[in-house]
Amino acid sequence: MSETADTNQTAVVLFSGGQDSTTCLAWALARYHRVHTVAFDYGQRHRVELACRQRVREAIGQHFAGWGARLGEDHLLDLTSLGEISDTSLTRERAIEIRDSGLPDTFVPGRNLLFLTYAAALAWRLQARHLITGVCETDYSGYPDCRDDTIKALQVALNLGMDSHFVLHTPLMWRDKAQTWALAETLGGADLVELIAEHTHTCYLGDRTQRHDWGYGCGECPACRLRAQGWRRHRGLC
């Protein structure tokens, strides 16, 4: 929601290891003196992203010394029960299809609501006021838990429920994928763009056997198509 922050405060970034969350991590590292990260194992078929996120953290420490010094604790939380109750193509080995509702069956009901609730509970313990998530309402699949109204409502609920003053930041909310690539370049130059292309993971099928100019992936799933189209627009190739 907010695009400004106090550099003397602490943040928690919901960091999956994908393009969007890595860009958000860079955004937070440019603003806060201490930035913790959290991810969730919810039985996702593309759980290779959980290994990628460690390589991203290591690469940030190696190539961005100032940012590396600000990186705080990393947390991986077990939410496999979400995968057990979800009947989706992100948590089952099946083809990706569009439901009668118009939503793709990659939508995992409650996922971002739970992620942010757990992240807020962690932030409460760490005395971190700022929560950063990479949800957006532009180049996305229509997921209702990615919408700006949802995040604003959740911020109110979390603050009431924890008697706190959290600020939920969504740096990508009104940016498309081309603008997300551009933001990464603004934040960390060509080195960050290359880090994202090489080390992050977006593909819903978990494919890291095919390397494209925009990164690894099957090239056919909705996540790969959005990432590839954004890259081409950012590079002026379409």
UniProtKB/Swiss-Prot annotation:
Pfam families: QueC (PF06508). GO terms for molecular function: ATP binding; ligase activity, forming carbon-nitrogen bonds; zinc ion binding. GO terms for biological process: queuosine biosynthetic process. The keyword Flavoprotein does not apply. It catalyses: 7-carboxy-7-deazaguanine + NH4(+) + ATP = 7-cyano-7-deazaguanine + ADP + phosphate + H2O + H(+). Signal peptide: none annotated. PANTHER family: 7-CYANO-7-DEAZAGUANINE SYNTHASE (PTHR42914:SF1). Belongs to the QueC family. Catalyzes the ATP-dependent conversion of 7-carboxy-7-deazaguanine (CDG) to 7-cyano-7-deazaguanine (preQ(0)). This is 7-cyano-7-deazaguanine synthase.
